């Protein structure tokens, strides 16, 4: 079939809805039967067959059990010595020691799978190469660096880290930041920006799901692509498990939209499953960029309800700072392609007059730097009056928990808002295991009773804030590709603080008692206790 015939066939399957959006999938195509007979079903069957074959081999060679036991003792000893000499957080080291002691072979295999980047060395090498190329295209304006140092030496030190070991991210002035306290607000602002595109539109999202939100966006993207705008869409491979079929990239390409799937699902055990692209970036012509917690699915704009009301947050950047967001997208897009940094990063950006400083930044799980966590800890350590946080999850390592508690013990008003209606029961149980230690140090915790808080927001002393995709959990801090925006002195900071206070007004205050924390849910309490010692492995 020729390319022209394919495009005609795919376009004939596009359905236009009264809401002005378009759909590429038929209603019901994402149901159980479709899942069973899709790539998801194939992957599941092949994985079960692989593990079944391994189990059968163990039974057939049961007469070698004494030799196996001797070997496992040796493996356990070697692995424990190795773990004790690794540069890792003790809250991560101890669970690995326990798992290795209880199940040596499984522990070693699991460690190699999650920690040693087996199968990811080429990806790691490629990303480091791309990061090096990006640095030269994102020079630091020395005048801006000096201005930040004069304004706040502590913030300048953070900027130095993000520019150096943190990944080569410069600090910018002249960048207007608009804060959106909901997915609906972001969606309303996003559509006219897409309509204004004349050169390119880049989208990188963790989740895309057909419906009102994506349909409206897709209609504009298809129209812009037909007008000659360079439209590119990238989404994480886990969408193939839950929301989109395997051939969805072909469907988009038939509309003139270039598409890439990060780490597609394969029917073999692979470390690709461990590292996911959790970023949410949208860039229009290099002059406007969006990020935050909002994915492209209807629950994020409360068009459909899953866990009560959905509370999210996002920011829109206009001006020089968008250049880094463009670079972050191009890094991921260029993993298997020739990079195009110079083509897009050297274009002039319309001049914008704005107060304050911003640093858009990314976090790569393969470079050995926990950038997202380091930024959070830095804000906690420099806080003098308050640190207000909205987060969907709370699965902490020792360093971040210590930073939260120490800030509160210094007299800082540390206040966290978490969901009253969680999306994952095991994550909810694990979060609650942290409540009492934090509360005992003076940290305040509230739960948003209308529904689920998916926003990732931290505001410090009303002067600095971080809004992005980075959750307070192990997967975000250790295993995901993430991004966020640090900001200081920008005009939207009072709006961020006001949103925190508005959200707090709808919360239940958690008191420092077991009854207040667990609310009599004994099974949830038991699950939290059982899961906590392996939390870093989840």
Annotate the PLM regions.
Residues 393-415, 419, 424:
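Helical hairpin unit composed of two closely spaced alpha helices linked by a short loop
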């Amino acid at each position: 079939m020729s390319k022209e015939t394919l495009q005609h066939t795919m376009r004939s399957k596009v359905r236009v809805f009264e809401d002005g959006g378009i759909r590429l999938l038929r209603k019901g195509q994402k149901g159980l039967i479709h899942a069973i007979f899709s790539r998801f079903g194939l992957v599941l069957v092949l994985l079960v067959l692989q593990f079944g074959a391994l189990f059968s081999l163990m039974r057939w060679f049961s007469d070698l059990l004494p030799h196996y036991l001797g070997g496992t003792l040796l493996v356990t000893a070697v692995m424990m010595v190795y773990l004790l000499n690794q540069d890792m957080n003790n809250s991560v080291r101890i669970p690995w020691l326990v798992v290795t002691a209880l199940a040596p072979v499984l522990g070693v295999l699991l460690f190699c799978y999650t920690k040693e980047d087996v199968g990811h060395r080429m990806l790691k090498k490629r990303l480091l190469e791309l990061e090096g190329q990006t640095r030269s295209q994102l020079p630091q304006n020395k005048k801006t660096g000096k201005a930040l140092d004069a304004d706040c030496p502590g913030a300048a030190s953070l900027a130095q880290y993000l520019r150096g070991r943190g990944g080569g991210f410069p600090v910018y002035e002249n960048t207007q930041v608009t804060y959106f306290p909901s997915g609906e607000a972001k969606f309303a602002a996003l559509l006219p920006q897409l309509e204004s595109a004349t050169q390119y539109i880049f989208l990188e999202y963790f989740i895309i799901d057909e419906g009102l939100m994506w349909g409206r966006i897709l209609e504009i993207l298809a129209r812009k692509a037909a007008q000659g705008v360079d439209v590119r869409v990238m989404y994480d491979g886990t969408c193939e498990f839950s929301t989109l079929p395997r051939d969805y990239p072909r469907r988009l390409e038939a509309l003139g939209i270039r598409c890439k799937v990060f780490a597609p699902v394969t029917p073999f055990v692979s470390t690709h499953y461990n590292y996911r692209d959790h970023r949410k970036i949208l860039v229009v012509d290099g002059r406007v960029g969006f990020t935050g917690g909002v994915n492209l699915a209807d629950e994020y704009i409360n068009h459909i309800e899953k866990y009560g009301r959905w509370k999210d947050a996002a920011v829109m950047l206009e001006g020089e700072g968008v250049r880094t967001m463009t670079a972050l997208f191009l890094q991921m897009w260029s993993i298997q392609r020739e990079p195009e940094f110079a083509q897009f990063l050297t274009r002039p950006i319309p001049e914008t007059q704005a107060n304050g400083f911003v640093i858009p930044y990314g976090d790569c799980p393969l470079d050995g730097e926990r950038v997202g966590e380091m930024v959070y800890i830095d804000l906690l350590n420099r806080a003098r009056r308050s640190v207000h946080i909205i987060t969907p999850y709370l699965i902490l390592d020792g360093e971040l928990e210590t930073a939260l508690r120490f800030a509160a013990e210094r007299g800082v008003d540390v206040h966290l808002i978490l969901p009253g209606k969680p999306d994952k029961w095991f994550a909810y149980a694990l979060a609650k295991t942290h409540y009492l230690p934090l509360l005992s140090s003076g940290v305040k915790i509230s739960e948003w009773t209308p529904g689920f808080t998916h926003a990732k927001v931290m505001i410090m002393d009303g002067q600095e804030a971080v809004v992005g995709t980075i959750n307070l959990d192990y997967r975000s801090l250790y295993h995901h590709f993430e991004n966020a925006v640090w900001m200081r002195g920008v005009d939207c900071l009072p709006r961020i603080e006001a949103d925190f206070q508005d959200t707090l007004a709808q919360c239940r205050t958690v008191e420092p008692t077991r009854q207040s924390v667990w609310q009599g849910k004994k099974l949830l309490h038991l699950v939290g206790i059982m899961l906590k010692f392996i939390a870093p492995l989840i």
